[in-house]
Regions:
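Active-site-adjacent beta-strand/loop module that shapes the phosphate/pyrophosphate-binding cleft
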Residues: 69-94, 106, 111-112
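A short coil-to-beta-strand element that immediately follows conserved catalytic motifs
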Residues: 58-68
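Conserved Nudix-box catalytic region and its N-terminal flanking loop in Nudix hydrolases
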Residues: 14-54
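A structural signal for short, well-ordered beta-strand segments
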Residues: 7, 65, 84-85
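Conserved N-terminal beta-strand and adjoining loop/helix that marks the start
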Residues: 1-16, 37
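NUDIX/MutT-family hydrolases
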Residues: 86, 96-127
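Short secondary-structure boundary/capping segments
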Residues: 7-8, 23-24, 73-77, 94-99
C-alpha cells in the first residue's frame, strides 16, 4: 500500500484547499489538500514538510496527524493510505502554487469546504468536521 500525506492548513476557522490541475488521471479538477507520496524510507512528518515546500512553498512548523483514509477507489489511484494532518503554523509567508500539480488554491470556511461538490474524496468531510 502506498502512503500519501495531506495537509489541512488552518487559518482561524478556514482551511486551505488546492484544486488539482486537469492533467492527472486521478481526481482531475477536484478540490483536495496539498501533499503527496511518501518516499521509500521517509518518515511521514518529513514527507509532509517536503511536499508542502514543493507544492505551496511553505514549511509547516506546528502540525499533528488528524486521521487516515483508505483510498475508496483503488481502480483510480491504486491501494493508498492517506495520512491527514492539520497544520496551524508555518514559515514562508502566504501559500502559493509551485509547479503544475494545482490550478488554484483558496481558503474556505470549514463548513463551506464540507459542502463542496467537487472534493477529490468525500471521505475528507468527516475529518474536516473534526476541526470544528
Amino acid at each position: 500500500m502506498k502512503d500519501i500525506v495531506k495537509a489541512m492548513l488552518l487559518r482561524g476557522t478556514n482551511v486551505l484547499l488546492a484544486r488539482r490541475s486537469s492533467r492527472p488521471r486521478n481526481y482531475p479538477d477536484r478540490w483536495s489538500f496539498p501533499g503527496g507520496h511518501v518516499e521509500t524510507g521517509e518518515a511521514l512528518d518529513d514527507a509532509l514538510v517536503r511536499e508542502l515546500q514543493e507544492e505551496i512553498g511553505l514549511t509547516p512548523l506546528v502540525f499533528w496527524k488528524i486521521g487516515e483514509i483508505i483510498e475508496p477507489n483503488p481502480s483510480i489511484n491504486g491501494d493508498v493510505l492517506y495520512h491527514m494532518y492539520a497544520v496551524n503554523a508555518w514559515a514562508g509567508g502566504k501559500p502559493s502554487i509551485v509547479g503544475d500539480e494545482h490550478s488554484e488554491i483558496r481558503w474556505f470556511s470549514i463548513h463551506a469546504a464540507c459542502a463542496l461538490q467537487h472534493l477529490a474524496l468525500a471521505e475528507y468531510v468527516p475529518i474536516l468536521r473534526k476541526l470544528l
